[in-house]
From Swiss-Prot:
Entry similarity comment: Belongs to the EDC3 family.
Organism of derivation: Schizosaccharomyces pombe (strain 972 / ATCC 24843)
Keyword terms of this UniProt record: Cytoplasm
Entry-linked InterPro entries: DFDF, FDF_dom, Lsm16_N, Sm, YjeF_N_dom, YjeF_N_dom_sf
Domain YjeF N-terminal: 222-431
Residue ranges constituting the Sm domain according to the UniProt record: 1-61
CC terms in the record's Gene Ontology section: cytoplasm; cytoplasmic stress granule; P-body
UniProt protein name: Enhancer of mRNA-decapping protein 3
Amino acid sequence: MSVADFYGSNVEVLLNNDSKARGVITNFDSSNSILQLRLANDSTKSIVTKDIKDLRILPKNEIMPKNGTKSPSTNSTKLKSAETYSSKNKWSMDCDEEFDFAANLEKFDKKQVFAEFREKDKKDPAKLLVSHNKSPNRNYHHKQNVLGPSVKDEFVDLPSAGSQINGIDAVLSSSSNGHVTPGSKKGSRETLKKKPFVDENIPAELHTTTGDILKPITPEQLSQGIALAIAKTSTDIVVENAAQLLSQFVFSVLGGHKRLSSRNHNSQPLVCILVGSHDHASAAVAAGRRLCAIGIKVVLRLLTPFNVDNRQLLMFQAAGGYIPTENFDQFLNKLTSPIELVVDVLTGFHPSIDKNSHALIQWANDLNVLILSVDIPSGYTVQKKNTAILPKWTLALGAVTTTLAQAALVKQAAGVSVFVGNLGTGSQTWAELGILESQVTGQYLAQISCTSTN
């Protein structure tokens, strides 16, 4: 039995200051511990439970007085009339015993309630993303150990925060010697335009340049993994982790410390970030803020501002970032340096575009500058051929989706380097969803190549 069972009951509340209030219980706010009464004059009174000294349930046939609250200064005439009125209504026959919550709680049948929940739940347990519903792997890859370690380490040694950016530089610098050949930007575009967007088989495994094996996951699984990480930590932590990874990748692409050193007399690089409406929109703005803090000029081109945390936009502008409100091309003409890099964050890991996104994709391709796509090149779909953005690099935040893995098979020969970054949300988050094999371990960033296994 809960407080809700007493809604509509007439009660008399004795407060700590010896004042009384009579009324009908209309609501109880359990989070703030506030009891709400409707007094005789149809007004409402809210009482904090810590101020209640005693509470008495009145008979239903008892008539409440017009004044719901009586103060200690009530005159003797009113007290006498109240006593006379109470005797006429047989108040003396009321029960003064305390309510036994423990005894009434035992009347609550928990088993019956949970049985009703199970009857109403029509979901198929086999479709739930729970680790015990996942079929274990029967066959092992030739590079995998058949016998696992006998003792599982509770802590994993990870690189220090100071070595993170050096690790990204090392991965980028070795990309030309790995499975992917960067080539020239112009050559990449010509080859990409000749490649049709055919329905290739989704690769079962992803092989990194260091020999590790990852497995692609669906966009829905990636979305659930990020949502679970936010539930365990906070939105700000997940956003800042993604922003740090993206900003350090851009920093390395632009040349790192040598490009931004005071000894370099070239103008500051200008980066344009195309931001759409998706889960990583706020992370893209936060990455732009971090780039502004180290001397890189950043301009945002927002598809819509409604999916971005307003705090991130304010902090971005406070750091020196640009959010043009006028014609974008006219704004660029006022700047002293041209755009050096376009960061494509239009669609996130859901490959869908609208008319506005299509126009921005055409605009970015016509700039003939370096392009970095986040999660997946915008405009790519597995259903039909669409005009897609033509990046030199693609950075997957968290894990590689099956859509990106399929796109990489088509575009990899054209010189598109695909990377996957660890969001730092912890392996337990992904293990709960049964997709731990999608995570990069031992490093913050890894370059991948897709090979289908049959």
